[in-house]
């Protein structure tokens, strides 16, 4: 079958790869003008995805991870208050993204193509683009266009993401930016700090080129802070060029006012071991934490995956792995069907996936509230 994917981030690329592996003609349409390299931080290794790719002849060494060995909590003075053994393998968003791109036929990736509208009939879907390019027909369209999905809004009018009451300041900074003594306690551990209405965590991820060598790796950090005033969120989401972003501001695009706020808050409110990470980060970025859940993960010949289907709180550590599970399960569901069975198969797949993520949708807000983050439950 011919399958079109709207959105070329990890969820869209993962679907493109699994569906290509199972014999479909797949094309990805990404609105950004070029590749999205360097736009994310750490991610948990996608074990199910790796198994699937290896079964289909792809080497996945580029998704290697830095293991953390302990989960350590510290206080404002840097003293360890809790220290538990825990092995967690972390890769990086850009390493996973680059690896997925490298395994896809270059001709299947189309940048600078934003889907404007779709029209479905009994035989397929016609896709129109904002730039006025010739429409494309496909047997199936996969919406992988993120938390603020335009396609989800078109399919289910009135359905929108809802702000959860807190934000995540984020960044990555090279391990070799520091004297090794200064960061010795942060290396190969997950280090966390909690105070009223905020939570900071950091861990190592591979270098931008995928290297795991000591000194070449990067610290990934996340700082969750309550920001219940939505007018403040609007200011933070307004980038240096005056553009108001929907839910996140990419690296290098924070306004001078937001950067000044971040640096002052880190200096005043974080342990020295952690504030130095923030101060040394050249291009921090921002994510407003939101909840989104599509009424269904499919409608007709259109399927929704990744954050377009539902947005999980980052505390679950499941956002990227959910995208991988979406991709693998969808490829398996579509592996042997005929064109006439598409709608029924997508309906069954959608019900299965929605049921699978239901526990994670409940877990995220509970974890946030246990840290004092977000709006209280009603």
Language-model features, listed with the residues they occupy:
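C-terminal domain-closing interface element
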Residues: 370-378
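Conserved FAD-binding catalytic core of PHBH/FMO-like flavoproteins
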Residues: 62, 79-80, 87, 91, ...
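Conserved mid-domain beta->alpha element of the FAD-binding
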Residues: 7-21, 25, 142-143, 169, ...
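Contiguous C-terminal substrate-recognition/catalytic subdomains in enzyme active sites
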Residues: 233-286, 290-291, 297-298
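Glycine-rich FAD pyrophosphate-binding loop
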Residues: 20-39
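Conserved Rossmann-like nucleotide-cofactor binding loop
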Residues: 11, 34, 148
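Extreme N-terminal starter segment of soluble prokaryotic enzymes
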Residues: 1-3
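Active-site-adjacent segment of FAD-dependent monooxygenases/related oxidoreductases
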Residues: 33-103, 371
């Amino acid at each position: 079958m011919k399958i079109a994917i709207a959105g070329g981030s990890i969820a869209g690329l993962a679907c493109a790869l699994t569906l290509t592996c199972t014999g479909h003609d797949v094309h990805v349409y990404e609105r950004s003008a070029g590749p999205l390299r360097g736009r994310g931080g750490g991610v948990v290794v996608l074990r199910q995805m790796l198994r699937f790719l290896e079964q289909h002849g792809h080497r996945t060494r580029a998704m290697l991870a830095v293991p953390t060995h302990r989960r350590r909590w510290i206080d404002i003075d840097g003293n360890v208050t809790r220290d538990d053994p825990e092995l967690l393998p972390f890769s990086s968003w850009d390493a996973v993204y680059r690896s997925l791109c490298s395994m896809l036929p270059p001709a299947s990736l189309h940048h600078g193509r934003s889907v404007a509208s779709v029209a479905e009939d009994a035989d397929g879907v016609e896709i129109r683009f904002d730039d006025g390019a010739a429409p494309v027909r496909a047997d199936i369209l996969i919406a992988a266009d993120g938390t603020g999905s335009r396609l989800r809004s078109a399919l289910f009018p009135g359905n929108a993401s809802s702000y959860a009451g807190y934000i995540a300041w984020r960044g990555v900074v090279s391990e070799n930016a520091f004297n090794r003594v200064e960061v010795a306690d942060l290396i190969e551990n997950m280090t966390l700090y909690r105070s009223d209405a905020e939570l900071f965590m950091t861990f190592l991820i591979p270098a931008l080129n995928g290297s795991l060598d000591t000194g070449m790796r990067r610290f990934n950090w996340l700082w969750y802070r309550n920001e219940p005033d939505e007018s403040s969120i609007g200011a933070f989401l307004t980038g240096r060029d005056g553009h108001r972003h929907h839910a996140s501001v990419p690296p290098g695009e924070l306004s001078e006012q937001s950067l000044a706020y971040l640096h002052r808050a880190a200096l005043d409110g974080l342990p020295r071991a952690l504030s130095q990470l923030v101060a040394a980060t050249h291009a921090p970025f921002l994510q407003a934490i939101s909840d989104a859940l599509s009424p269904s993960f499919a409608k007709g010949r259109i399927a929704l995956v990744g954050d377009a289907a539902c947005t999980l709180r980052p505390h679950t550590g499941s956002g990227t792995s959910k995208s991988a599970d979406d991709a693998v399960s969808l490829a398996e569901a579509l592996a042997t069907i005929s064109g006439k069975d598409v709608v029924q198969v997508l309906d069954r797949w959608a019900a299965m996936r929605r049921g699978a993520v239901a526990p994670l949708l409940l877990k995220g807000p509970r974890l946030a509230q246990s840290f004092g983050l977000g709006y209280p439950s009603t």
